[in-house]
UniProtKB/Swiss-Prot annotation:
It is found in: Cytoplasm. InterPro entries: Alpha/beta_knot_MTases, RlmH-like, tRNA_m1G_MTases_N. Specifically methylates the pseudouridine at position 1915 (m3Psi1915) in 23S rRNA. Pfam families: SPOUT_MTase. It is an enzyme of class 2 (transferase). One of its GO terms (cellular component) is cytoplasm. Keywords: Cytoplasm, Methyltransferase, rRNA processing, S-adenosyl-L-methionine, Transferase. This is Ribosomal RNA large subunit methyltransferase H.
Length: 153
């Protein structure tokens, strides 16, 4: 199984969260190969200075090239909240799963409509770096639920 976490976020070594991301990638290896793809370019930076709508369009343009294969799931605070068991079902029986974390202004509705699903981790606002860690933990938890591993107890 292959899981991609595709996020609109500046690339770079984050000394606080990066070790946690690497930890979850490593412990997920028996179940899936997890890759984090960070996207941020001059076009996105410029669009964010113009307007929220321009920013969303630039996010869609950057993210759409990853929509081609597998199950596509956007993290969207306005979407359905899921618990860990519902989240695990999203991973079950899939060869490739792509998770999308939008930029500061979220997703265009058109991008969300191109995804197979959109889920929320709740109504609180989390930084991109922190939501990436939460997603990585939930991916590992979901994989362990699906494989009857004792982690989820």
């Amino acid at each position: 199984m292959k899981i991609n976490v595709i996020i609109i976020d500046k690339k770079g070594k984050d000394q606080l969260y990066a070790p946690l991301i690497e930890h979850y990638k490593k412990i997920s290896k028996p179940f899936a190969k997890v890759e984090v793809i960070e996207l941020f370019d001059k076009e996105i930076a410029k669009a964010q200075d113009i307007s929220p709508e321009a920013a969303q369009r630039s996010y869609s343009k950057a993210l759409e090239k990853y929509l081609g294969s597998g199950i596509n799931i956007a993290l969207d605070p306005a979407s359905k909240e899921v618990d860990s068991f519902e989240f695990a079902k999203l991973l079950k029986d899939s060869v490739t799963v792509n998770f999308y974390i939008g930029g500061a202004y979220g997703f265009e509705r058109d991008f969300l409509s191109k995804c197979n699903n959109a889920v929320s981790f709740g109504k609180i606002t989390l930084s991109h770096k922190l939501v990436k860690v939460v997603l990585m933990e939930q991916i590992f938890r979901g994989l362990t639920i699906n494989h009857n591993h004792p982690y989820h107890k």
